């Protein structure tokens, strides 16, 4: 998979791309990442990429021409089979022939909420371009040159770089061979195997810590009983913590007693 990132601050990604699962994916060749700044296509001596908003208002707006030219440059580089950037010493950028045009994603609080289903969809694409905003946001016309808009949630940050890292991390762990145990991704919160439920509680040693014990059923080795317990706990946790997910998965309200408390 190839991921292009349009950002005014490529240096923010250096540490993120060098460590952990993302770093290993780059080193193995499962992932290639290129960052490029729209300032390369900025105007004037200072390479300006923003301007005052028409109609007045506070703040500065990112120019459509600088963003689009940056995206087009990435497409041109992909068409030429240009190798992507990678951490020092990592041979994650080998390319044979033209690379596909990236699916363009605008990172904005006005976008559709980013969910596991979207991560699965993006991870299946050969190439994705993530566009990070700054200042007061984008010129509205940028939206005519992207394929979709994604939001991390109902809050606003100073830029889209953290959102881009979240999208990259969520997608990379779904790539074949990246996660050490592929089964782990199949039985975690929001996974298809759990039908959209939250993951059941997990325990490890010690058996008891300051009065808190590992449930007996997990220590007895009865796999059928453990599976039933985990399913019941996943349902209970979802009903208690995310009734919206319960309604989506079950098509109704979580079971509750007369006081409104969710029942086991």
Curated annotation (Swiss-Prot):
GO terms for biological process: tRNA N1-guanine methylation. It catalyses: guanosine(37) in tRNA + S-adenosyl-L-methionine = N(1)-methylguanosine(37) in tRNA + S-adenosyl-L-homocysteine + H(+). InterPro entries: Alpha/beta_knot_MTases, tRNA_m1G_MeTrfase_C_sf, tRNA_m1G_MeTrfase_TrmD, tRNA_m1G_MTases_N, tRNA_MeTrfase_TRMD/TRM10. Residues 240-264 are annotated as: Disordered. Its main location: cytoplasm. Its EC number is 2.1.1.228. Gene3D superfamilies: 3.40.1280.10, tRNA(m1g37)methyltransferase, domain 2 (1.10.1270.20). S-adenosyl-L-methionine binds at residues 133, 152-157. It is found in: Cytoplasm. The keyword rRNA processing does not apply. Belongs to the RNA methyltransferase TrmD family. This is tRNA (guanine-N(1)-)-methyltransferase. It comes from Sorangium cellulosum (strain So ce56).
